[in-house]
Amino acid sequence: MNETTDFGLLNSQTDERYGERPYGHFGTIAKNGCGMIALYNIERAADETIRFEPFYAARKQIKTNFFGLLGTRPSSIVKNLREKGFEVQKIRLKKAEHAERYDGVIVLAWYFFGAHYIAGIANSEGTYTFYNQFRRPTPMQLSAFLQSLKNTKQHPIRVWGVRFPQKAN
């Protein structure tokens, strides 16, 4: 694989093409890299020229919890996006149904085995398509997606709305 390999948006952190790569000091993308996958999907949706190899090389030591074994720190997600020119706003869970429209969202949900990041990319019809969520990418309203997580014993604990940087003409 080289820097020009294009995976597009990623829907599985366990994909054999990249899942066993190190993440943090002791983790792997497959086991603990959902935060990195969410970041990649947001950045890739904003700029289709982004490729996984250079993205991974630049972020493989992003701040993690417990040396990578407990995934990505939420503050690292926000900091990384803001450093790249993205506008990031916290969305109150109780107000998600009426939240303003963003180019993308990142959901942090708690479930039986720990926490999990899921990126949603805005569609033209007013929904988001959610990636790396243990099933096929699904277009849904944000509030419906959060309810679907609750219905499967996952509990949304944080949601961020993301606006993509303005491209120079």
Go through each PLM region and give its residues.
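Active-site-adjacent structural segments surrounding the nucleophilic cysteine of cysteine proteases
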Residues: 1-66
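Short intrinsically disordered terminal tails
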Residues: 1, 167-169
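Conserved active-site-adjacent core of cysteine acyl-enzyme catalytic domains
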Residues: 43-167
